[in-house]
């Protein structure tokens, strides 16, 4: 068998090298994620596993810090801390070096399905390609795409340079790919392919179709503000597909979402989520955190911003003059009638203690905060929460959470979602609040979707609660009736802030999604001008291209820099869909 290995770039995936034949089943067993000259369906699980392996790692190492879910406790100089907007080269490369590899494999998978005359597997490949290339372009902006895909399929290695497509053109093609995928899966007579090849959906084409159309809703929302501002809301596509009105198409998808079927069926419940499995028993299926020591795992602390949003707290000022929020236990913590205070039922699923670390502290101030007796228990233990981890691998002791003392595991979970079902409710709530979908443009319409999104997110994260549990019901009422949105209760004027703040919470551990929403809308409102904030107090708008691109792509790379980055590979230029007046003005509030 020929084993396909897609090499590092012009992009890592642009060349395809063929290794010698492999005849030993033992060798295949040692590396089940190498891609062989096998049926197209054999590509599915290796690509999905490696993609999610990368994205959960990116969330913990980058997104969690940029989006103020967490704060680094490393005692290095503050100028090198990611949450202070100083991005090291290795972090800049993360998405590029991993997802381009898998995108190249998806290109190969698609070609295989064409050669097999297998439209259903072509559709699955198109969905995977769309998922991957949107993550790549959302991270960097303009990137190699069309020519790069052609190079993947070439047998020679004479050409290394490839054009950088504009993000707008990439999104045109993504919409066409998702339309084509939906069309092919709508007419396929096959119900399944091999479950062995697909550990996400067990080979069920219907669920792949629902995932593809759910991704379509995300894609439309991603570009809608820009297309409306730039093109009056209509995006031209290719010769096959007519121009798409983003608001009208979102309305069409919403009707299908509401009905659970139709021409664009989408996820119906959390059971339809794309859950990628991991295993502690198989070394080829370990999470990226499997061998992480307690010391390294605990370098990520919960941010004070997140604590103040999710829990009932008192604002305090410590002896060093640092403002922070101190948790006030609710009646659910002591399991008896009490103050009636409420707390987010998801908090326990993420953090082991209930106080947070303020963002953007200078290194000395951060060290003093963590070392201060004011922020420790009587036993001398820090009150600042770290991520839940299930079992401590060094001691074998199961570690419990902050509020209920339950056991959750983020370090070595059995599966992680690529996309949450709850995201759809937030997408359509936003579309309703913006007046893009008339049937839900009234306050009650998008409020119900907001409440449904919050409820579904709680159920996605906390297996110990049910919809009608008092803790869930009272928290939901608090989200609507509490003065949580710029000091006001939920109303039509602050609806976008409310919807997108709760969407931010719901996107915990989902790759780069909350970072994309922030750049697109400016929500949640995040303070970006703290004492240690770098990058001119601008939360990074993109990741820089890898430093070796000038060497690997000497013609196209400088052209891309000059075309849209002003000649400088920077973290401050907006990608195409984020460059709107509304987004800029909302993000500016964080520096005021």
Please annotate each region the language model reported.
Residues 1-30:
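Bacterial Sec-dependent N-terminal signal peptides
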Residues 22-70, 90, 97-100, 108, ...:
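Membrane-proximal, proline-rich intrinsically disordered regions
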Residues 38, 73-128, 132-461, 489-494, ...:
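Structured, solvent-exposed acidic/aromatic patches
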Residues 190-195, 515, 526-527:
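Long amphipathic alpha-helical coiled-coil segments
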Residues 434-519:
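C-terminal structural cap/anchor segments
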């Amino acid at each position: 068998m020929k084993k396909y290995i897609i090499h590092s770039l012009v992009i890592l995936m642009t060349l395809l090298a063929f290794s010698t034949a492999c005849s030993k089943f033992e060798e295949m067993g040692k590396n089940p994620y190498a891609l062989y000259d096998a049926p197209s369906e054999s590509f599915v699980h290796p690509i999905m596993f490696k993609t999610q392996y990368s994205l959960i790692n990116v969330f913990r190492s980058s997104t969690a810090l940029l989006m103020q879910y967490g704060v680094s406790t490393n005692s290095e100089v503050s100028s090198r801390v990611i949450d202070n907007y100083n991005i090291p080269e290795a972090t800049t490369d993360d998405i590029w070096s991993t997802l381009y590899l898998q995108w190249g494999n998806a290109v190969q998978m698609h070609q295989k399905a064409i050669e097999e005359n297998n439209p259903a597997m072509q559709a699955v490949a198109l969905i995977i390609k769309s998922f991957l290339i949107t993550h790549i372009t959302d991270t960097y902006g303009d990137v190699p795409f069309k020519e790069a895909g052609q190079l993947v399929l070439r047998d020679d290695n004479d050409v290394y340079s490839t054009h950088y497509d504009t993000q707008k053109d990439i999104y045109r093609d993504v919409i066409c790919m998702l339309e084509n995928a939906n069309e092919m899966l709508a007419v396929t007579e096959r119900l399944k392919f091999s479950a062995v090849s697909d550990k996400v959906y067990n080979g069920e084409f219907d669920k792949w179709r629902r995932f593809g159309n759910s991704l379509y809703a995300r894609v439309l929302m991603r570009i809608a503000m820009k297309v409306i501002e730039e093109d009056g809301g209509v995006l031209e596509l290719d010769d096959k597909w007519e121009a798409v009105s983003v608001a009208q198409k979102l309305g069409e998808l919403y009707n299908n979402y509401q009905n659970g079927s139709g021409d664009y069926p989408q996820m119906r419940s959390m059971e339809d989520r794309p859950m990628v499995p991991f295993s502690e028993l198989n070394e080829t299926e370990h999470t990226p955190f499997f061998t992480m020591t307690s010391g390294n795992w605990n370098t990520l602390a919960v941010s004070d911003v997140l604590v103040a949003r999710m829990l009932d707290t008192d604002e305090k000022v410590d002896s060093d003059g640092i403002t922070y929020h101190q948790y006030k236990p609710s009646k659910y913590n002591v399991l008896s009638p009490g103050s009636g205070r409420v707390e987010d039922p998801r908090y326990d699923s993420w953090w082991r203690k209930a106080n947070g670390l303020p963002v953007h502290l200078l290194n000395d101030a951060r060290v003093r905060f963590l070392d201060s007796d004011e922020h420790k228990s009587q036993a001398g233990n820090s009150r600042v929460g770290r991520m839940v981890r299930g079992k401590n691998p060094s001691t074998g002791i199961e570690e419990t959470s902050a509020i209920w003392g339950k056991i959750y595991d983020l370090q070595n979970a059995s599966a992680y979602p690529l996309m949450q079902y709850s995201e759809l409710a937030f997408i359509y709530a936003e579309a309703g609040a913006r007046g893009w979908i008339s049937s839900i443009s009234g306050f009650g319409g998008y409020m119900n979707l907001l409440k449904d999104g919050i409820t579904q997110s709680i159920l996605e994260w906390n297996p110990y609660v049910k919809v009608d549990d008092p803790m869930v019901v009272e928290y939901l009422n608090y989200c609507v009736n509490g003065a949580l949105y710029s000091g006001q209760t939920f109303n039509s004027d602050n609806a976008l802030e409310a919807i997108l703040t709760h969407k931010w919470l719901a996107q915990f551990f989902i790759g780069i999604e909350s970072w994309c929403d922030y750049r697109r809308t400016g929500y949640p409102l995040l303070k970006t001008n703290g004492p240690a904030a770098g990058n001119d107090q601008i939360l990074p708008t993109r990741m820089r291209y890898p430093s070796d691109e000038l060497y690997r792509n000497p013609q196209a790379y400088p052209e891309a820099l000059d075309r849209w980055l002003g000649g400088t590979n920077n973290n401050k230029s907006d990608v195409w869909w984020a460059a709107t007046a509304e987004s800029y003005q909302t993000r500016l509030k964080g520096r005021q």
